[in-house]
């Protein structure tokens, strides 16, 4: 596959340049969503807030450069890019700590495998790498446990593609991948088992825009708002023990969102009855729960960690090919 070959060549080239380095690396895939941060094993809210005094409790608390931060509370506001402030850097440290704890490590050489929307990949890739590698050696504490990491390098992969990389070899002649994330919807056709980059589309109309519409209608009709966590719960399970009037508004807005997604797919020339379509990302469960299409050609990958797993898989493949990883 052309796209995968290109990614692997980048890692092979770096392998020749750094052939003297220690091969023992901890590859950590991280999906930096605007709503949720994901690794191959962890999911937490994309929230970080400075604590101005020494905390009484250290659960989900990051200590970095003499400051304390609460991780995973209220979602960050969406910005034009992910490198405008230190929020995603701090969230990356938290994600690394969570993964290292799972692996029983406090010190490690880390190779970060991350992603960006396919159509913004070229424009934002270098800035994202510089942002994540601005400090080669990092000392910090998470939940009052000390960590020392050396960030060896960063590989950036296209999201959406990463979510299905393990399934591409078994795909039909033409398959459409629709990755519904927090802020964007990526539409990627795979033709003869290779992504057609010329027809990839990124739409800035993900789940956060749906939740905003829900609360706008709740305020307009009932003069009250619903917590995003409650809305996400309804998206995930299709039900909730809340007031019927609010529930009706939420369901109506979600159904409208789903229909707009299908309309976008139609507008780009795909037949909803014949084109094999795979929904991935956090919105896959929304399409499954609230969509009106129950066709054999439509399937759903409900694993919200699929992109993070794909990033880690792609990076591991490249590093092994470059003999930088045993």
What are these regions (language model features)?
Residues 1-177, 194-209, 221, 229-326:
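Nucleotide/phosphate-binding catalytic cleft detector across ATP-hydrolyzing
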Residues 180-186:
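Ser/Thr-glycine-rich phosphate-binding loops at phosphate-binding pockets of nucleotides
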Residues 225:
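Cysteine/selenocysteine-centered motifs that mediate thiol-based redox chemistry or coordinate metal-sulfur cofactors
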């Amino acid at each position: 596959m052309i796209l995968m070959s290109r990614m692997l060549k980048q890692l092979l080239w770096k392998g020749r340049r750094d052939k003297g380095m220690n091969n023992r690396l901890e590859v950590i895939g991280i999906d930096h969503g605007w709503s949720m941060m994901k690794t191959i094993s962890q999911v937490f809210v994309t929230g970080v807030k400075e604590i101005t005094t020494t905390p009484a409790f250290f659960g989900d608390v990051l200590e970095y450069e003499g400051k304390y931060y609460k991780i995973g509370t209220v979602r960050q506001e969406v910005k034009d890019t992910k490198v405008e402030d230190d929020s995603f850097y701090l969230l990356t440290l938290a994600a690394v700590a969570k993964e290292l704890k799972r692996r029983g490590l406090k010190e490690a050489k880390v190779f970060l495998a991350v992603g960006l929307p396919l159509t913004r990949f070229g424009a934002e890739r270098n800035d994202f790498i510089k942002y994540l590698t601005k400090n080669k050696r990092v000392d910090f504490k998470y939940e009052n446990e000390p960590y020392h990491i050396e960030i060896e390098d960063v590989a950036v992969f296209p999201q959406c593609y990463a979510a299905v990389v393990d399934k591409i070899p078994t795909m039909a002649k033409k398959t459409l991948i629709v990755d519904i994330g927090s802020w964007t919807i990526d539409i990627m056709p795979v033709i003869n088992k290779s992504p057609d980059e010329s027809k990839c589309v990124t739409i800035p109309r993900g789940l956060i825009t749906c939740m905003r519409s829900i609360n706008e209608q709740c305020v307009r009709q009932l003069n009250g708002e619903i917590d995003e966590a409650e809305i996400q719960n309804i998206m995930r399970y299709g039900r909730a023990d809340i007031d019927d009037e609010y529930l009706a508004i939420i369901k109506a807005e979600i159904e409208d969102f789903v229909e707009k997604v299908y309309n976008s797919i139609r507008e780009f020339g795909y037949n909803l009855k014949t084109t094999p379509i795979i929904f991935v990302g956090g919105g896959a469960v929304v399409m499954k729960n609230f969509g009106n299409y129950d066709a054999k050609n439509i399937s759903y990958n409900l694993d919200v960690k699929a992109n993070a797993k794909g990033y880690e898989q792609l990076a591991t493949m490249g590093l092994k090919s470059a003999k930088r990883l045993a």
